[in-house]
Amino acid sequence: MKDMGKKITGALGLLAATTLVAGTVVAPEGVSAQQQDQVPPAAPALEWDPNDPRIGLGAGWLDAESAISGMELLAAIPRPDGFFNPSTPADGRFSNTDLAFQDGLLIQGNYNGFQIYDISNPADPTLSVSVVCPGGQGDVSVYGDLIVMSAQETRGRLDCGVEGVADSISAERMRGVRIFDVSDMNNPTQVAAIQSCRGSHTHTIVTDPADTENIYVYIQGTSRVRPGDELPGCSGGGPEDPETALFRIEVVKVPLANPSAAEIVNMPRIFADEQGNLAGLWQGGNHGPGTQSSRLTNQCHDITAYPGIGLAGGACSGNGILLDISDPVNPTRVAEVSDPNFAYWHSATFNNDGDVVVFTDEWGGGSAPRCRATDPATWGANAIFRIGEDGQMELAGYYKLPVPQTETENCVAHNGSIIPVPGRDIMAQAWYQGGVSLMDFTDPENPFEIAFFDRGPLSIESLFTGGYWSVYWFNGRLYGAEISRGIDVFRLTPSEHLSAAEIAAAESVMINEFNAQLQPKVEWAPS
């Protein structure tokens, strides 16, 4: 890898980029976006450095050109056999999804199951075991001897079989969360399969400091409601139907001593208003001339729990919300915001102090090019909110990838985590084929990029879904889950934006486990 201003050409370079496109940045002042009845100014146009080395990178699958600044690529591990289609590398049935970490292990989720890698030497990850278990998305979390995995597709089977389910109604179908016993990491065993009406697009492990015998799993379902003939009690009715499977999440209680007894213990109506209307938040549609059309709030895409502050951030289609999780079985909404620049609220990340939260907008669903020159700087971006002493959120600024991407690169804000640099708020983030971007939001009104890595598109002729699903910091290194290419490992390097001492302080923070949706509170040892 070479530093900013230079590119690297892949050894097999099959395709060459032809068109320079433009990108984004900036935290505009005066855009007060959280009030639903407010008509904001027009979204600002994109701004970028025309000399940015990410512009014009050559295309390819494993041989694309790349550009890097403030980081060093230590390892690039292709997806193993059984987790990609050699004839169609972008085959979505084998996409890499989210990551989880425990000690010297990395768990890589995939639409076709999951893999466990030994990362005791981060520069040389080695595959320990693969578990084939189709059903998508395959997002994973780890806690002690348990791995939890989301399943939402109708092809998912209770027995993890690869043959799928042909019948429209079947007792063999699995849509919900799977729990695997990994006390023997070389022989993961499914011990529970908790069915839910909409399946599990994502899930969140929630812990209770006062309860060491159980963990809780919040199920976020975004797919269609399955028939009641397949799972009794499932209804796809509107908010007037008290039994509807919409407008809720599910809470699963998992006894650590007997995880096979895991069960749904609550289905809280976290969008209800004071009158009990289940559809109490954003009703869907645009916010006025020149604004986004935001989805109806009847689901959460992601919930990030931060037990250290007793809150969770919910990215819930048409709203961003805060939940009081002091009682994990009964989360209650304490704040909500909407934003006329957001199409679909996707994920949330708190700063370490818990007084700022970053929400992402997955405009285009993650499969569309949304980082082009013609795309507004506040659409498909991060919105950064201060959390006041009263617990309410106030918009501070926006951040979007500050570089243009092409028409054949799916690109929008996606998953990331905090890098624990003392005294600063820094987030590493995936932008699909926009690559990796490190955002400094210590001043929430003026966020800016401090490091990046990007590859050229998979193709300059056609748009194939690829790029980074997630990028997370774990014990001194950054790990990126690349949808179509595999796993990348980075270390930070000193730059004008980040000193060697700051990097060393971040690298000194060691934790046993990391799930991005269960955010830990970091404390640094006295220097």
PLM region spans:
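Short intrinsically disordered, low-complexity coil segments enriched in acidic
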Residues: 1-3, 118
